Amino acid sequence: MCEEEDSTALVCDNGSGLCKAGFAGDDAPRAVFPSIVGRPRHQGVMVGMGQKDSYVGDEAQSKRGILTLKYPIEHGIITNWDDMEKIWHHSFYNELRVAPEEHPTLLTEAPLNPKANREKMTQIMFETFNVPAMYVAIQAVLSLYASGRTTGIVLDSGDGVTHNVPIYEGYALPHAIMRLDLAGRDLTDYLMKILTERGYSFVTTAEREIVRDIKEKLCYVALDFENEMATAASSSSLEKSYELPDGQVITIGNERFRCPETLFQPSFIGMESAGIHETTYNSIMKCDIDIRKDLYANNVLSGGTTMYPGIADRMQKEITALAPSTMKIKIIAPPERKYSVWIGGSILASLSTFQQMWISKQEYDEAGPSIVHRKCF
């Protein structure tokens, strides 16, 4: 450890799919690992192998063939606290190799996170990890910080949940936040389903990870879905091949854009919800008429599920069709948007003006977990 890191703040962004952790002031997270806890499916027979009863992150991923994988964060909200503790423990001690009792820690949470959840996070940080100070920030707000803005509407779509969060002068407007339980994991499941129609079978939790890789490498968003379907039907120009871990090669055609099209047409997976372009528009329409212009001009994309090629152009086209014809519409898709929540946290935690915002151990001891509602908004 170098000297200046003796009390640097830690930033830990816990997503449904990936946990991003690192030091405030850095421009990227040091540790990015899957938010997975795996437990063996079989009885250990070899003595002295040092088999553990649970594995976290990349180690769970690499041994996935013999484990049952569980995600403690579902739809952006922590549902399994014991496993979550394992993930935090892993990120502090194994990934960052720090003692959490020496570092103020910034955590992130989903918009509209249940109150009891923030309290529980606060309690675990102070009582289990003995942090000297902590803060809980809303993910979408951090993404906006990372893009250098204080006003805009963020479309934050990760592995477990998608949110539209309008923010004005640094304040999220809770009445206009839209939540859509459709994100990367659902797209992976949908891709598994449509690949099955092609005769490729993917079923286990381990095979799902292979499909996720196919999705990340080959999928894209079509500007005009019907046109693209016609092109795919009449020629093989859109086909790509992918080599599976066992050497078998599979071909994928219109699945490449049918999979992410679900974001715009959730009916593909039997959801009654509006697509991401409509939820963005609805969210803007719930805001005060005077600030809508600023929101239309600052549509910020964030999260791994906004990484599909073509998504920004398609959003531009769809929102232009919904909005008043004279409105200037701008979609901002920063190249580092996969990690923009973490980057925003890194910026926030290293601001000198932020230092009085931390919840200190002393304040926690005096007021208890509910302090988090007063200090973090």
UniProtKB/Swiss-Prot annotation:
<dbReference type="GO" id="GO:0008217">
    <property type="term" value="P:regulation of blood pressure"/>
</dbReference>
<dbReference type="GO" id="GO:0014829">
    <property type="term" value="P:vascular associated smooth muscle contraction"/>
</dbReference>
<feature type="modified residue" description="N-acetylglutamate; in Actin, aortic smooth muscle">
    <location>
        <position position="3"/>
    </location>
</feature>
<feature type="modified residue" description="Methionine (R)-sulfoxide">
    <location>
        <position position="46"/>
    </location>
</feature>
<keyword id="KW-0007">Acetylation</keyword>
<dbReference type="GO" id="GO:0030485">
    <property type="term" value="C:smooth muscle contractile fiber"/>
</dbReference>
<comment type="similarity">
    <text>Belongs to the actin family.</text>
</comment>
<keyword id="KW-0963">Cytoplasm</keyword>
<keyword id="KW-0993">Aortic aneurysm</keyword>
<dbReference type="GO" id="GO:0061870">
    <property type="term" value="P:positive regulation of hepatic stellate cell migration"/>
</dbReference>
<dbReference type="InterPro" id="IPR020902">
    <property type="entry name" value="Actin/actin-like_CS"/>
</dbReference>
<dbReference type="GO" id="GO:0030027">
    <property type="term" value="C:lamellipodium"/>
</dbReference>
<keyword id="KW-0488">Methylation</keyword>
<keyword id="KW-0514">Muscle protein</keyword>
<feature type="modified residue" description="N-acetylcysteine; in intermediate form">
    <location>
        <position position="2"/>
    </location>
</feature>
<dbReference type="GO" id="GO:0015629">
    <property type="term" value="C:actin cytoskeleton"/>
</dbReference>
<dbReference type="GO" id="GO:0010628">
    <property type="term" value="P:positive regulation of gene expression"/>
</dbReference>
<dbReference type="GO" id="GO:0009615">
    <property type="term" value="P:response to virus"/>
</dbReference>
<dbReference type="GO" id="GO:0044297">
    <property type="term" value="C:cell body"/>
</dbReference>
<dbReference type="GO" id="GO:0072051">
    <property type="term" value="P:juxtaglomerular apparatus development"/>
</dbReference>
<keyword id="KW-0378">Hydrolase</keyword>
<dbReference type="GO" id="GO:0031514">
    <property type="term" value="C:motile cilium"/>
</dbReference>
<dbReference type="Pfam" id="PF00022">
    <property type="entry name" value="Actin"/>
</dbReference>
<dbReference type="GO" id="GO:0072144">
    <property type="term" value="P:glomerular mesangial cell development"/>
</dbReference>
<dbReference type="GO" id="GO:0090131">
    <property type="term" value="P:mesenchyme migration"/>
</dbReference>
<dbReference type="GO" id="GO:2000491">
    <property type="term" value="P:positive regulation of hepatic stellate cell activation"/>
</dbReference>
<dbReference type="GO" id="GO:0001725">
    <property type="term" value="C:stress fiber"/>
</dbReference>
<keyword id="KW-1017">Isopeptide bond</keyword>
<feature type="modified residue" description="N6-methyllysine">
    <location>
        <position position="86"/>
    </location>
</feature>
<comment type="function">
    <text>Actins are highly conserved proteins that are involved in various types of cell motility and are ubiquitously expressed in all eukaryotic cells.</text>
</comment>
<dbReference type="InterPro" id="IPR004001">
    <property type="entry name" value="Actin_CS"/>
</dbReference>
<dbReference type="GO" id="GO:0032991">
    <property type="term" value="C:protein-containing complex"/>
</dbReference>
<dbReference type="GO" id="GO:0070374">
    <property type="term" value="P:positive regulation of ERK1 and ERK2 cascade"/>
</dbReference>
<dbReference type="GO" id="GO:0016787">
    <property type="term" value="F:hydrolase activity"/>
</dbReference>
<keyword id="KW-0547">Nucleotide-binding</keyword>
<dbReference type="GO" id="GO:0005524">
    <property type="term" value="F:ATP binding"/>
</dbReference>
<feature type="modified residue" description="Methionine (R)-sulfoxide">
    <location>
        <position position="49"/>
    </location>
</feature>
<feature type="cross-link" description="Isoglutamyl lysine isopeptide (Lys-Glu) (interchain with E-272); by Vibrio toxins RtxA and VgrG1">
    <location>
        <position position="52"/>
    </location>
</feature>
<dbReference type="GO" id="GO:0070062">
    <property type="term" value="C:extracellular exosome"/>
</dbReference>
<dbReference type="GO" id="GO:0005737">
    <property type="term" value="C:cytoplasm"/>
</dbReference>
<dbReference type="GO" id="GO:0061874">
    <property type="term" value="P:positive regulation of hepatic stellate cell contraction"/>
</dbReference>
<keyword id="KW-0225">Disease variant</keyword>
